[in-house]
């Protein structure tokens, strides 16, 4: 892992005009920031058996009237042997996030790999970094009032080795430390680097091109994680195709594991870019915008970890129904959110086709990813139709970006393909309606992404419904919806019936 130096132009973005639609945390809304440099936060014994003092830099929005702001502790990279809190992407990320409204504490920590270098000595270096990062979190809790920090919204981020530090701080419990690590020698994960008596709890992670030793350390109920990586990274894997000193499971694997455990997550992959995204300015800025949108939802979430099992009762009802019904291999599964669930006449409307009707919720695309094995895997299917993502674009602070809906859908498809390698999969376009007209541009963008993705994969299709549901003026048609101005009435489902029948007639 080499030192990377970024020109400051990365963060010198035009601040001259902001639309009313720009929002704190999601967008850059502060023209200037304040910086405080080299603030001591702790000390500990390094590998030379010397006492090493630790410092951090604080970035915060200038002239901010908010008294309690979310905090991001940022950990620089450098392979646990070099790097600095103020150079390269460390400064770029810290300044960019501060311009969005966060307080950012960029830290230095103990560096050095004990000889002889091995997977064990790299793991021990990571533990030392975790101990120091935890001390930094405790420092901000201890001094929250001085720095205007909201202690209920403390997040950790890092790049490369710093991301490895952040990930293991968040997900590696003391009892999970591998047996080959001598904790008597290295001390506990909490460490003694300073500010004892205060909590080191964090509420989310942003992983820039990092990896984990064991992805099974992420489990249901753990804090959310967002991941940024280049798919051509030859230093740290974005997948699991190789390892950096036993750090084998990169951003894509972490993203998929989080989805499987119901942990809020996201990923921004840059195709054909390497470690640190090859210093590519547009890619860095695009990734930071995606990070900002994800953090905006996280900051505004009432619960750090939403209840992924809120539709468990409905899923169990479907499972009971499945156990009592002998579906044939010609059955066609329709699953998704309330647009599917409320289609009460679906079996009659699509007769004589054999329909498995498994809508649930109000569900979102992450809940589809969590439940799709239980919804589909007990069947032999002729085709699969899915309507999901509508509730991720609901004019809410919890809305996903179109890219995150696409990436989550890709994971759903990956799961389905493990069981149904050749079965046709149809994604039904997200429909226009009055309740969500304010985000119609995002819905259109999402539909286009899903359509393009489906067109590149075998036996995958996109069911276009938009033109039939819009009026001559290009707007939603109120006469197609019930009083909630969202769901279809009989006329709306008549249009869907006509389109689905035409689509089903083409199934081979």
Regions found by a protein language model. Give the residues of each.
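Oxyanion-hole/transition-state-stabilizing segment in secreted/luminal serine hydrolases
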Residues: 340-354, 368-406, 426, 430-434
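Alpha/beta-hydrolase active-site loop
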Residues: 122-145, 408
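Catalytic His-Asp segment of secreted/periplasmic serine-dependent ester chemistry enzymes
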Residues: 277-279, 285, 431-508
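C-terminal catalytic histidine-bearing segment of alpha/beta-hydrolase fold enzymes
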Residues: 248, 255-304, 482-508
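Short amphipathic alpha-helix adjacent to the substrate-entry channel of hydrolases
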Residues: 86-106
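Primarily recognizes the serine-hydrolase "nucleophile elbow" in alpha/beta-hydrolase
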Residues: 135-221
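Short beta-strand element of the alpha/beta-hydrolase
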Residues: 67-78
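N-terminal cap/lid segment of alpha/beta-hydrolase-fold proteins
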Residues: 21-67
